[in-house]
Amino acid sequence: AAMLGLQNMEVLEETKDGEGIGEVGYLPAATTVTALVVLIKEKFDLKNVILYGNPNDTVEKIAICPGSGKSVINEAVQKKADCLITGDIGHHEGLDANEMGLTILDASHYGLEHIFMHIMYEYLKGYCMDVEIGIADVGVPFSIL
């Protein structure tokens, strides 16, 4: 969310322990889906993002769920998000979300989660001085031909 400059963040789906799954917030200014895709590809170093929706639609309130997003579609709709950025969405769930007025951007699990490896690496280095820590950054595990 921070990488996209989202503001006024809140938890997308609250869990029993007071934490939550995903986040929802606002872009600094409304933009087109196409412009948002360009930003996502730039910030996350991606070649592709799968779109369920209209590339010319305007979006401002954005929900993010880096893992599978199918379980938070209803929450995103209830919180009036214009778009859900997720790491995985099924074909039918993407179509169903569109019918509810929600644009879906599937950036893949790797696409949204690879940045976490470097954050966790630095964290573990600080706490596990006697253990060799490494990163196996193998890249996107699939090809779009």
Question: Which residues make up each language-model segment?
Answer:
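Hydrophobic structural segments
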Residues: 1-145
